[in-house]
Amino acid sequence: HWQDFLYEDLKELEENVFFPQFSNNGNPNLNLWLEQLHKLEKHINENTVVIAHSMGVILWLNYLNKYKKTRILNTILVAPPSNDFLKSNKTTNSFSNFILDKDLFHDSTNKSLLIASTNDEYCTEKEKKAFANILKTNYLELPADSGHINIDSGFGRWDDILKIALDN
């Protein structure tokens, strides 16, 4: 997955990087993941760049709603799933009905970017653009063959995400 490569590349550049692994990926539980993320709060500060993919995007937004933290440097949200998808899927419905609080999100980060593709099976183009508009974030649309921006859609090593992560 591109996240593994990004983690290794950032470590090689001697960046201070954390790549939390959340339990039970096959059957994720929002409350459990929130607890696990909260244990890392001492590492979240004004120099933090959060890069979240898919369910991680929803986790981060819920974390902000629950723990309103220090303003961070940059937030990069990649391929968020739609609420309709989350609700319709038994393994992800604990993540559904999330709140998109534009003021809270805007106040939580100096800079932000939503990255999505036009053919992500977990979120329609209309939903992604609405997501970006509600959060008042910049929006980068990847080519139509990018899918969910994961290994299944050809995203092993993804050099552009390293450039984006370092662009502060």
Predicted regions and their residues:
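Catalytic histidine-centered segment of alpha/beta-hydrolase-like enzymes
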Residues: 28-29, 145-158
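Gly/Ala-rich beta-loop-alpha elbow adjacent to hydrolase catalytic centers
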Residues: 51-61
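Acidic catalytic loop of the alpha/beta-hydrolase fold
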Residues: 84, 118-123
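Active-site nucleophile loop of the alpha/beta-hydrolase fold
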Residues: 22-25, 75-85
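Active-site catalytic motif of lipid deacylating hydrolases and related acyltransferases
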Residues: 1-46
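Catalytic histidine neighborhood in serine/cysteine hydrolases
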Residues: 15-18, 133-150
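Short beta-strand/loop motif that positions the catalytic acidic residue
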Residues: 108, 113-116, 120
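Conserved alpha/beta-hydrolase fold motif
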Residues: 49-51, 75
